[in-house]
Amino acid sequence: MQAFLKGTSISTKPPLTKDRGVAASAGSSGENKKAKPVPWVEKYRPKCVDEVAFQEEVVAVLKKSLEGADLPNLLFYGPPGTGKTSTILAAARELFGPELFRLRVLELNASDERGIQVVREKVKNFAQLTVSGSRSDGKPCPPFKIVILDEADSMTSAAQAALRRTMEKESKTTRFCLICNYVSRIIEPLTSRCSKFRFKPLSDKIQQQRLLDIAKKENVKISDEGIAYLVKVSEGDLRKAITFLQSATRLTGGKEITEKVITDIAGVIPAEKIDGVFAACQSGSFDKLEAVVKDLIDEGHAATQLVNQLHDVVVENNLSDKQKSIITEKLAEVDKCLADGADEHLQLISLCATVMQQLSQNC
């Protein structure tokens, strides 16, 4: 018996009472219920169709379907960050309610494999499922499902062709919503089966108002000038602007967000650097030009960003139309070469040499 007790240790702690156990479990559940940080893009995504801004035509059609009218197959196209995905998700939530949303909606985007095999199997199998169930709140529920194909312009032509027959055969129980940036990349047989809606780029005023609302709710210190600059660097993409605003808030830690902070967050090349490149082109010294370009690359600035910002400078400059056309054509060539993986240093030198050549004609 003593040998057995040597291998054990006697606990002197009092046993856990029922109350203490309940308190411990309550504490752990309280920690679990603590709000998790959510990206502001998702937090402030429109929850209903009425919250969608600046897209009156598509909102009117979706409202009719919410009132009981049939929903056609849809094709949303337009620039990124204008609310295409948010609009159809908000409409689906209103149509089906939170309980049936996951059962009635299939969403596939560019991160999913969407070749011809997926269209034939996953999409087809989902479309063939029978529709059942009713909403717990008593509101009418439409007798169909919705398949959302985000960034449909990246689907192969074979996959798009395979989708045609599925859209026709399952028209009684399934509606399709294709979302893309470039409608020209969608084959004509698909576009003819859908009601097309172009999402207009959001106006600066609407973007500024939305960002000010978010800043107020999140207690962010930013001036009206800062909001205007944020809209400018995001280039009409509200999703990008909201992401920049959240990143800048985390960086400043409660202090006021300045234009310099936004410039750092957005990866924008400072205006004085762009002016320096233009001044080097005007100087006529190739050595000076090469040194400026080398400094920009060594500092980690993206060549594509320089191309975009240099384009704005050229357009606003008082050059002749012929000079602007030659420079912008070269900008397009360099942009294509960079997209194909060409050397950044050589492409920027070539671009700036063309700018220098055209500026020298003013002398």
From Swiss-Prot:
Subunit of the RFC complex, an heteropentameric complex consisting of a large subunit RFC1 and four small subunits RFC2, RFC3, RFC4 and RFC5; the RFC complex interacts with PCNA. Forms an heterotetrameric complex with RFC2, RFC3 and RFC5; this complex has ATPase activity but is not stimulated by PCNA. The heterotetramer of subunits RFC2, RFC3, RFC4 and RFC5 interacts with RAD17. Interacts with ATAD5. Interacts with CTF18. Interacts with CNTD1; this interaction facilitates crossover formation. The lineage of its organism: Eukaryota, Metazoa, Chordata, Craniata, Vertebrata. Changing residue 344 to K: In MRMNS; uncertain significance; decreased interaction with RFC1; decreased interaction with RFC5; decreased interaction with ATAD5; decreased interaction with CTF18. The gene is RFC4. One of its GO terms (cellular component) is nucleoplasm. This is Replication factor C subunit 4. It holds the Pfam family AAA. GO terms for biological process: DNA repair; DNA strand elongation involved in DNA replication; DNA-templated DNA replication; positive regulation of DNA-directed DNA polymerase activity. Changing residue 281 to R: In MRMNS; uncertain significance; decreased interaction with RFC1; decreased interaction with RFC5; decreased interaction with ATAD5; decreased interaction with CTF18.
